[in-house]
């Protein structure tokens, strides 16, 4: 069994490599994303909180290439590149955390409901239908407003309440297909426990789909966090975010006369999300190919 899993993992890696070789856009996107994450997190490691909290009015709204500021400064006299790195790190952290929770909850519930089916599955699916029709954005905004001592963890928890539904339904649908395959029937006949069948036999066969889903969920979470922060309902006040940087564009004067304060963040979000989507589409094709050949 261990040798078989090892071969499957090698086959998965090989399939992904081959797809990336064929899809040059996905390959370039992968290299670009790795570079972005390395630059953002390594750069952030060497910054102190005072670097992006302290205000220097004398350097307020300096234009790019002025006094050593390559992209200029913001309304607090802080370097735009520095703020961009910190903001990107914070936005990525929120997206990573929500994506992790989404995948864990979505995979567990999806495999369980898809495996057992029956009345439990019916009731659970009606519950997810109800949650999906709720105005999640409005509810998140309400929670952000009323929760005392709101912080980054609060935001992660609130977003995660609604984020697992899509992943659960996707994993459930694929699990229901796997349940009817011969290897599952053979395991049931041999007396293998339901837990082992679900998470040692079925779930590994969904790994490509899970990876593809993770990339797309991550892209969506970056967009959601950015949107909430742009509206003023994201990260706590004083915490830099790509959304709060873009919020500078709501000031007509800043939007037209000082575009360097918000354009860099907009460009970063656009390119990063597009790169993730290109990678996700390539991984989804790998998942579909592996499913078709089984």
From Swiss-Prot:
One of its GO terms (biological process) is transmembrane transport. GO terms for cellular component: plasma membrane. Residues 88-280 form the ABC transmembrane type-1 domain. The keyword Cell membrane applies. The keyword Transport applies. It is found in: Cell membrane. It comes from the Bacteria. Keywords: Cell membrane, Membrane, Peptide transport, Protein transport, Transmembrane, Transmembrane helix, Transport. The chain crosses the membrane at residues 27-47, 94-114, 127-147, 151-171, 202-224, 260-280. Coiled coil: none annotated. Belongs to the binding-protein-dependent transport system permease family. OppBC subfamily. Part of the ABC transporter complex OppABCDF involved in the uptake of oligopeptides. Probably responsible for the translocation of the substrate across the membrane. Essential for uptake of peptides larger than three amino acids and for growth in milk. This is Oligopeptide transport system permease protein OppC. The gene is oppC.
């Amino acid at each position: 069994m261990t040798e078989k899993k090892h071969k499957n993992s090698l086959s998965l890696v090989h399939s992904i490599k081959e797809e990336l070789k064929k899809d040059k856009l996905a390959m370039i996107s992968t290299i670009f994303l790795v570079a972005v994450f390395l630059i953002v997190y390594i750069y952030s490691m060497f910054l102190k909180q005072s670097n992006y909290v302290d205000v220097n009015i004398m350097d307020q709204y300096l234009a790019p290439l002025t006094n050593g500021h390559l992209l200029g400064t913001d309304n607090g006299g802080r370097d735009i590149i520095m703020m961009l790195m910190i903001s990107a790190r914070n936005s990525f952290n929120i997206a990573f955390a929500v994506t992790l929770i989404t995948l864990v909850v979505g995979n567990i519930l999806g495999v369980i409901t898809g495996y057992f089916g029956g009345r439990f599955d019916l009731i659970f699916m009606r519950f997810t239908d109800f949650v999906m029709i709720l105005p999640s954005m409005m509810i998140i905004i309400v929670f952000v407003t009323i929760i005392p001592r709101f912080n980054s963890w609060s935001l992660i928890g609130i977003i995660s309440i609604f984020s697992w539904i899509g992943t659960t339904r996707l994993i459930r649908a694929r699990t229901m297909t796997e349940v009817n395959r011969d290897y599952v029937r053979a395991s049931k006949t041999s007396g293998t426990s339901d837990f082992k069948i679900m998470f040692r036999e079925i779930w590994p066969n969904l790994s490509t789909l899970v990876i593809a889903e993770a990339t797309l969920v991550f892209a969506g979470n970056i967009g959601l966090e950015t949107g909430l922060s742009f509206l003023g309902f994201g990260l706590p006040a004083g915490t830099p975010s790509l959304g709060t940087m873009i919020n500078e564009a709501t000031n007509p004067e800043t939007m037209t006369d000082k575009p360097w304060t918000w354009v860099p963040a907009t460009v970063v979000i656009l390119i990063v999300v597009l790169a993730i989507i290109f990678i996700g589409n390539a991984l989804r094709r790998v998942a579909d190919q592996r499913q078709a050949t089984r």
